[in-house]
């Protein structure tokens, strides 16, 4: 990002979407039950895991304690995490961990302004 003084500072954006997100519990055409949430996460994971044979993939799950933290919903997340942990070559982490990893593996190299 170019700053007002003309210098350049790194700016990393970790993808976030409403696809695998508990906000869909409060949207029309969203999740009605924890089972719907679990099945959607599992199907998404299975597709990405298969695609990951060729190149790394990332699955971001948006969670909000006021939504997913309900007694009838939190079990679906626990079941999903158990399912994912049964697979090899999977890293379960927080968004900040993804950002730190990206910055370490792909350090910022400023490009020439106007190039």
Regions found by a protein language model. Give the residues of each.
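C-terminal domain-boundary segment and adjacent tail
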Residues: 35-115
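Active-site-adjacent pocket scaffolds in enzyme catalytic domains
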Residues: 1-55
């Amino acid at each position: 990002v170019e700053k007002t003084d003309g210098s350049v500072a790194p700016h990393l954006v970790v993808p976030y979407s409403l696809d695998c997100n508990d906000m869909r519990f409060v949207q029309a055409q969203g999740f009605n039950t924890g089972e719907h949430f679990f099945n959607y996460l599992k199907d998404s994971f299975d597709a990405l895991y298969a695609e990951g044979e060729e190149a790394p993939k990332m699955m971001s799950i948006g969670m909000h304690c006021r939504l997913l933290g309900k007694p009838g919903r939190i079990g679906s997340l626990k079941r999903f995490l158990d399912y994912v942990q049964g697979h090899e070559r999977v890293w379960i982490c927080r968004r900040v961990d993804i950002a730190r990893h990206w910055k370490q593996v792909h350090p910022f190299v400023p490009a020439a302004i106007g190039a």
